[in-house]
Amino acid sequence: MLKGITFFLIISCLSVQLLSQEQDSIHEKKNLLQRMDSITNWKVSKGRSTFMPFIAPSYTPETSLMLTLGGLFTFMTKPGNKILSRSSIPFSIGYSVNGSLNASIRANIYMMSDKLRLTAEYWNKNMPDNYWGVGYINGRDIPQSDSTTAYHRKWQQFKFKIAYEVLKNFFIGINHDRNKTKSSDVNAVMEADSNYMLYGDDIHNSGFGLVFRYDSRDFPENAYKGILIELASTTYGILKSTTSKYKAYELDYRQYQTIVRKGSTLAWQLKTRLTRGDVPWTEMSMVGTPFDLRGYTWGQYRDFSSIFLLAEYRYMFGRKKPNGRGEMFGPFGFVVWTGTGSVTPEWGDFTYWLPNAGVGIRFEIQKRMNLRIDYGVGAGSTAFYFSFNEAF
């Protein structure tokens, strides 16, 4: 753990140097950042599009050390509309020392004076991976090795939700999820796994469903106050190309409270997922992703149902003088969080709970949009994440 914390601190320092373009003095660094901030603020105030590139290392148990290239593209679907939030499309592509090649795009687009909202994600992974089987006990007790868990996975997923505001803060919409997994170099233990034997090594899924949402957050990407309650249901197997037929239900509750001043926020989230039917081993409910219990191996804990609870405190440091937007808090901050989660074959029978905690550093690259550096600790594992916007 000490090595992980040391690595986290070293990378954080390198990130600051990269953002400052390694000028010769602290004074020049501050001037450069102020000029960049002024240019970005001017573009944002005029409703113009902006682009922020980055290159940075990250570390997770499933990918090992990875070098990632990416960027954040923001824009207004209708410049000059003060009611409308800025749309954002962060993306990244990374290659790791264990041969993983991962790419992702996550979009939040606001239209029609914020009455129509589109969220979309695309993932593409070609990587050595591990499969422990289904259930908490397997994830905990089966040792990770080439002969017990290792295999190679090619995975693609595209999903979106589009919702329309029918009443103030109340949205109704549809969602779609399409994914496919191709596994190879499977070990003997995995070949004998009943779930793997049932669904095989080439799995395709396509689902459609409904979304019901209450959203009073002041800014969805980085809320200071407000509540999100979202209920989504997805039915898979409608299309002939789908491997199996099943249903998935999700409930996502988030709340944000400003503490004393803006930039000091207490946020918490409760999310659960329930599946029913012929659910493939690739699409079981999971905890331990970069967006919930940060610090675990993605995919180690999976079952028909999952639940997790997170509480996170976010703080942006103050300024001596207000910036161009008249704000007294600066572009740097930190977060601390703690949480727990569980997986189970039957919803409500959550017997075993996974602990989680972590710390993070934030760099505001434009108004209310942060570069996220997180170090998470789980039960016997740690992970280091470099991404845009908050985990929730």
Can you describe what each PLM-predicted range is?
Residues 1-25:
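Bacterial Sec-dependent N-terminal signal peptides
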Residues 53-55, 89-93, 118-122, 172-174, ...:
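Membrane-embedded beta-strand positions of outer-membrane beta-barrel proteins
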Residues 43-52, 58-200, 204, 370, ...:
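Gram-negative/organellar outer-membrane beta-barrel architecture
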Residues 37-49, 77-86, 112-117, 169, ...:
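Short loop/turn motifs that connect adjacent beta-strands in outer-membrane beta-barrel proteins
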Residues 74-78, 92-100, 125-129, 179-183, ...:
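Sequence/structural signature of outer-membrane beta-barrel proteins
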Residues 51-53, 67-69, 101-105, 154-160, ...:
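Hydrophobic, lipid-facing positions within transmembrane beta-strands of outer-membrane proteins
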Residues 217-327:
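C-terminal outer-membrane beta-barrel translocator/porin domains of Gram-negative envelope proteins
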Residues 92, 143-148, 192-199, 235-241, ...:
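Extracellular loop and loop/strand-boundary signature of outer-membrane beta-barrel proteins
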